Amino acid sequence: MDHYIDIRVQPDPEFTASQLLNALFAKLHRVLGQLANGKIGISFPEVGKTLGECLRLHGTEDALSTLEKTSWLKGLRDYTQVSECKVVPNGVKFRTVRRVQLKSSAERLRRRSVSKGWLTAAEAAARIPDAVEKRSALPFVQIKSLSNGQMFFVFVEHGPLQNAPTAGRFSSYGLSTEATVPWF
């Protein structure tokens, strides 16, 4: 995790920053699943109520160079500004950037309980009220599942700052519950 690349989305009248970030994240997810082998992490340096307009890739120079040699940004080059692969500055802190999954939809929970044979439709309606739905204030990206075509949210949580890095593997989203990325 000694190098990084910043990718800044550039909204225009056709596409908002969040639409572009969603598309960027979806493309990155596909290429990381094929190529990165858990060696590339991400962060959002402008995170607040939203994830901001910048996605930062973290990895070794080799891992990031391999990623850059692919055409994974095809179709988004006109809407992004990509920095050079740079060395992480000295004296930085570290943090995890992880996915938070919510069991949020009461209707989905009812359907699942019925399809698994745990409950009948009437039992599910009685036992799983709408009040069980959880909401999150975390920032997110919205992407489309390639397996079933449904849209879903990937909620992203930036963990507390730490003084030392923690090694580990990153998912095909570039997120991890244990591995840290440099924060600056």
Curated annotation (Swiss-Prot):
One of its GO terms (molecular function) is RNA binding. It is an enzyme of class 3 (hydrolase). Its EC number is 3.1.-.-. InterPro entries: CRISPR-assoc_prot_Csy4, CRISPR-Cas6/Csy4_sf. Keywords: Antiviral defense, Endonuclease, Hydrolase, Nuclease, RNA-binding. Induction: Expressed in late exponential phase (other phases not tested); part of a large cas-CRISPR3 polycistronic operon. If the spacer DNA has a perfect match in the chromosome then toxicity results. Suppression of the toxic effects occurs via mutations in the CRISPR/Cas machinery, or via target deletion, which might contribute to genome plasticity. This CRISPR/Cas system can be used to remove genomic islands, and possibly other genomic regions. Pfam families: Cas_Csy4. GO terms for biological process: defense response to virus; maintenance of CRISPR repeat elements. Disruption phenotype: Loss of crRNA processing, no chromosomal targeting. Homodimer. Part of the probable Csy ribonucleoprotein complex with cys1, cys2, csy3, cas6f and crRNA. CRISPR (clustered regularly interspaced short palindromic repeat) is an adaptive immune system that provides protection against mobile genetic elements (viruses, transposable elements and conjugative plasmids). CRISPR clusters contain sequences complementary to antecedent mobile elements and target invading nucleic acids. CRISPR clusters are transcribed and processed into CRISPR RNA (crRNA). Processes pre-crRNA into individual crRNA units. Belongs to the CRISPR-associated endoribonuclease Cas6 family. Cas6f/Csy4, subtype I-F/Ypest subfamily. This is CRISPR-associated endonuclease Cas6f/Csy4.
